[in-house]
């Protein structure tokens, strides 16, 4: 039995997904919250937020993600980074999932992935959990109600947490699986309730399709100056490095917090919402994000709360350090309605340095920017992936290796071309540790990071004196009014400068060893900018 608004020629039955119980198409937020609460998927929290737990999976499962190895993508997928699945195994998985789904209730959301109408994908999300429908309705872009009558999905995502895959039969690693089939235009997700898999599977899809159209797909946040869409900035970074926090700046308009494209027309958000980390979130440091946690229909994921008062405990990481909330962009007062911006004037690469070696900000040449983009040095922050309980130094190329289906040089060369064509200034910003490594030093003060970023974005930082860093070759400001000058010289923040030198040497060697894999594919200017 079908409920809701849908193109009558594009029901699930018409797609060959038959025999289901109730199917609810394109329910709006109140109906999805009502369904989720009624079905016992979670609780109504303060202000009407939806409080839920994702069970055993509180982060992504990157080792359980696959791409079906079909002729059309055989030569363009980066197979060293993307596990292949045999087409026959996929067909068995798909058939078994559809059989499992029969008689059960499902929720369908027809949504746009991409704010640029010429480049967007029309995506259908089929979810077993009502709150997953609510989550993805926040995260992607919502069509007008009338547009649903003619909506034809380009791609379909089926998420069925109650289905367990069979590794032997389905060609996967465990009973959890996330698999993309570019020939069938189909994504299957099984045996995980972690909502982030929904959005990141669509992101992976766009990261494959858009570069083929000359569009740079980016794991970044973006904003622009108030009233000036041409003064745009993008912030690359892995989960937990500060993309959401640092782009939510009251003095600038937020384009988006996580996934964007850079086309010949400028930047555009892939999404229509935000997925913010909430661990240690405070009303003082991040008032707008904090306020969303008690707004109607915000999805509050894996946060501990008082059973009687429903008060959230922002400091409790007993379920996971990866506590999050998902909300529509219009819950942020200065968010862009269009999701569009001009060509970035500033490109910022965020890193969370657990070694405590890198300065809080450094100016990069275009070649150095390409080097750091391909290197993607950061630290995996606790909770964003299963099993990560403390920061782990890592190199994640393009600041998002788990979501990059193509070889890194494809994205690197696209970015290099965009930076050169539009004259963007590039910066490396360390939101990690200072005064010592993780466990000894302390996190970089967010107040200092914000002050340095503000100066970079308004152009005033370019007017101060810079020094050349002896280890990494980039330029570091010597001082900036309002920022402790010691912070700008990481060596001086360490109690033992010799220990800093030893740590810096170790990090330089790690950079050099990691970058060796890209040397055959890069131009001479980037080779010259290489460290070590």
UniProtKB/Swiss-Prot annotation:
GO terms under cellular component: cytosol
Pathway: Carbohydrate biosynthesis; gluconeogenesis
Cofactor binding annotation: Binds 1 Mn(2+) ion per subunit.
InterPro entries linked to this entry: PEP_carboxykinase_ATP, PEP_carboxykinase_C, PEP_carboxykinase_N
Subcellular location(s) per record: Cytoplasm
Binding of substrate, residues: 60, 194, 200, 324
Disulfide bonds: none
Keyword presence, ATP-binding: yes
GO molecular function, one term: metal ion binding
Primary location recorded for the protein, binned into one broad class: cytoplasm
Annotated EC: 4.1.1.49
GO terms (BP aspect): gluconeogenesis
Positions of Mn(2+) binding: 200, 219, 258
Pfam families on file: PEPCK_ATP
SUPFAM superfamilies from the UniProt entry: PEP carboxykinase N-terminal domain, PEP carboxykinase-like
Catalytic activity reported: oxaloacetate + ATP = phosphoenolpyruvate + ADP + CO2
Coiled-coil annotated residue ranges, if any: none
Entries under NCBIfam families matching the protein: pckA (TIGR00224), PRK09344.1-2 (NF006820), PRK09344.1-3 (NF006821), PRK09344.1-4 (NF006822)
HAMAP family (UniProt xref): PEPCK_ATP (MF_00453)
Family to which this protein belongs: Belongs to the phosphoenolpyruvate carboxykinase (ATP) family.
Function: Involved in the gluconeogenesis. Catalyzes the conversion of oxaloacetate (OAA) to phosphoenolpyruvate (PEP) through direct phosphoryl transfer between the nucleoside triphosphate and OAA.
Name assigned to this protein: Phosphoenolpyruvate carboxykinase (ATP)
Name of the gene: pckA
